[in-house]
Amino acid sequence: MSMKSHLELFKQKKSTAYILLTVLFGIGWATLDLPVMVAMNIRPSISMRPIKPYISWLDSLLKPLPFNSAFGTNSTAHVDLREFLLFIGLNTSPCVSETIAIFLVCCFDRSIFIATEYLFLILLPLRGLCHQFCEQKYVETI
């Protein structure tokens, strides 16, 4: 199923089951990416690449998107979402933040955004611990 047909189906059927399925899809992608993040930290030559151009690209990608109309009359929704995604981008591997960005952009639904925001705020400390553990092991081997 392509992203376009996925979004069309989501707009037509905003059923609880379909929303739950979409959230589970996002959770699945995030969970599968944890080993990738750990592997990138074990091999510092991969993880030490400059992240600033990536953050600039993500920021420019999110600017034209109509989040305010999707989230209702909340004028701060656009800024909050961009700040949240940039925060994720600074604290996780590029693979993780791309997955989150694509997932949220495709959903355009406030309830799903809130659910994923809480989920990833719970996952972030775990990712931080993985980063610390991998960095410590790398320093010990030098």
Curated annotation (Swiss-Prot):
What is the superkingdom listed in this entry's lineage?
Answer: Eukaryota
Keyword tags: Membrane, Transcription, Transcription regulation, Transmembrane, Transmembrane helix
Q: Does the keyword Zinc-finger apply?
A: no
What sections of the protein cross the membrane? 19-39, 84-104, 111-131
A GO cellular component term found in this entry reads: membrane
Report the protein's function: Identified in a screen for mutants with decreased levels of rDNA transcription.
Q: What else is known?
A: Almost completely overlaps INP52.
What name has this protein been given in UniProt?
Answer: Putative regulator of rDNA transcription protein 16
